[in-house]
């Protein structure tokens, strides 16, 4: 019995690489698949939140969706100012902001109520599968953790962004959280031992460490923290055109296979290098999701086993 089976018992080993688990989700934008009549050709600049712009995978997905919808006109994706996540989402929420047009963040019922979500997990749902970035001297604290009760008893503190839904998810599961509003500062706080684990998504952690270039930071090798946490593209509540364009573009990419190619290109390496299938899974509940996103998230967790088998080949 693998570590995964031991910890997850009821999870069924069924998966189709990140596409079929959500390509039939009902859209909040319309009653069915959005259709586009012939549009007057225009050109538009789309300001993408700087953290997403700096992520090759997220920027590539946004550009893929825009490329698939040429009837909307030419486009250019521009890097936003260095806004905190909270500031970027506030700018989107108020609408008509010139500072940011698109942001990819973890979803929550509250976020979906004040912005338009494009309801496709951009990384196939991998954001909800998290590993710990740690200092080497902290590794013994993780050695005997086999389940959530062990994790709580270890008194390991997890660092997270103050505006991230993850902080509330972890807290709701009885895990102590230390937070800061700036992502970059959290790495410094880890080095100063303000907490023991900086939990980062499987889809982002290798890129994070490549950018940090800090030999004092390592990835804890045995644990995988898992909870339903779909990561969506969000736009302002009054920007229906961008929402429809992004959704239509992603749907077209799913149906022509280029979305699968995108996932393979940007995320297969992480699954292989992080040895996810052999890790002990610490399964958490996420009380923050809307009913729709809860269904998406749980489907993703239930399909984890086959996801890992496919991507690790």
Residues of each region from the PLM?
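Periplasmic-binding protein-like
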Residues: 125-131, 138, 210-247, 269-292, ...
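A ligand-binding cleft/hinge motif common to bilobed small-molecule-binding domains
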Residues: 93-94, 101-114, 197-217, 224
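Short loop->beta-strand "edge-of-pocket" segments that line small-molecule binding or catalytic clefts
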Residues: 38-53, 144-163, 196-197
């Amino acid at each position: 019995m693998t570590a995964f089976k031991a910890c997850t018992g009821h999870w069924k080993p069924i998966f189709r690489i990140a596409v079929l688990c959500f390509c039939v989700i009902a859209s909040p934008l319309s009653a069915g698949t959005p259709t586009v009549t012939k549009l007057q050709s225009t050109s538009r600049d789309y300001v993408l939140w700087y953290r997403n712009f700096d992520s090759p995978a997220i920027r590539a997905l946004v550009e893929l969706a825009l490329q698939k919808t040429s009837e909307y006109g030419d486009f250019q994706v521009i890097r936003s100012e260095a806004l905190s996540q909270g500031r970027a989402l506030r700018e989107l929420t108020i609408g008509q902001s010139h500072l940011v047009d698109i942001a990819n963040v973890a979803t929550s019922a509250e976020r979906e109520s004040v912005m338009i979500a494009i309801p496709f997990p951009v990384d196939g749902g991998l954001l909800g599968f998290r590993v710990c970035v740690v200092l080497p001297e902290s590794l013994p604290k993780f050695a005997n953790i086999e389940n959530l009760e062990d994790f709580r008893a270890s008194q390991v503190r997890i660092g997270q962004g103050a505006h991230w839904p993850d902080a509330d998810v972890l807290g709701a599961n009885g895990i102590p959280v230390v937070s800061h509003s700036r992502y970059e500062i959290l790495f410094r706080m880890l080095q100063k031992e303000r907490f023991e684990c900086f939990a980062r998504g499987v889809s982002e952690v290798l890129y994070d460490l490549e950018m940090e270039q800090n030999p004092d930071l390592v990835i804890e090798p045995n644990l995988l923290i898992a909870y339903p946490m779909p990561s969506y593209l969000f736009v302002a509540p009054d920007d229906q055109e961008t929402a429809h364009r992004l959704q239509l573009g992603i749907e077209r990419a799913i149906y022509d296979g280029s979305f699968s190619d995108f996932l393979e290109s940007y995320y297969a390496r992480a699954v292989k290098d992080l040895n996810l299938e052999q890790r002990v899974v610490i399964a958490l509940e996420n009380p923050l999701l809307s009913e729709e996103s809860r269904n998406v998230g749980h489907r993703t967790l239930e399909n984890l086993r086959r996801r890992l088998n496919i991507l690790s080949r």
